[in-house]
From Swiss-Prot:
Protein's recorded name: Co-chaperone protein HscB
S-S bridge residues: none
MF-aspect GO terms: ATPase activator activity; protein-folding chaperone binding
InterPro entries, per database record: DnaJ_domain (IPR001623), HscB (IPR004640), HscB_C_sf (IPR036386), HscB_oligo_C (IPR009073), J_dom_sf (IPR036869)
GO BP annotations, alphabetical order: [2Fe-2S] cluster assembly; protein complex oligomerization; protein folding
Gene behind the chain: hscB
Chain's role: Co-chaperone involved in the maturation of iron-sulfur cluster-containing proteins. Seems to help targeting proteins to be folded toward HscA.
Family: Belongs to the HscB family.
Length: 172
């Protein structure tokens, strides 16, 4: 059973976050290992496995990028284990330029303001790419959606690096 079915959703990108959380709590209550303390060992093990699957499914479906990766995996695009790399040279050059820009920010006199501006720019890029990915997933354009997810992974890492720099600057 796939994660969408487990939570009673159709296998598509759009998931109601509130409903997901409510169904997660219901499933947790239903399969919590404490409810199976007096059950035979086989039943306890099955409950533990089911609880683990429920937790994994929830973590996957609640995170937009993980949800997209999972949906693609259901359609034959295993992005997490693939050896394919991005072939979009312009995007890769843009990423290298952005990373260089981020490295230089730390040493600027106006690092706080520059970092805020940089962070806003990256957030806008993520927003645009996410909208494109959602449209591709809705249209079942799986190869294009997979490419967008690969690009969003780069941007996600860049956002994480930006947050780490912000924490370092605040700690100074």
């Amino acid at each position: 059973m796939d994660y969408f079915t487990l939570f009673g959703f159709p296998a598509r990108y759009d998931v109601d976050g509130s409903l997901l959380a409510a169904r997660f709590q219901d499933l947790q209550r239903q399969f919590h290992p404490d409810r199976f303390v007096t059950a035979p060992e086989r039943d306890r093990l099955l409950a533990m496995q089911q609880a683990t699957t429920i937790n994994d499914a929830y973590q996957t479906l609640k995170h937009p990028l993980k949800r997209a990766e999972y949906l693609l995996s259901l359609h034959g695009f295993d992005i997490n284990n693939e050896q394919q790399t991005l072939r979009d040279t312009a995007f890769l050059i843009e990423q290298m330029t952005l990373r260089e820009e981020l490295e230089v920010l730390e040493h600027r006199a106006d690092a706080d303001e520059a970092l805020m501006s940089f962070s806003d720019k990256v957030a806008k890029m993520v927003q645009v790419r996410s909208a494109q990915m959602i449209n591709e997933l809705d249209c079942q354009a799986w190869p294009q959606a997979a490419d967008s997810v690969r690009k969003l992974r780069f941007l996600d890492r860049l956002q994480q690096q930006t947050e780490q720099l912000e924490e370092r600057l605040l700690g100074m």
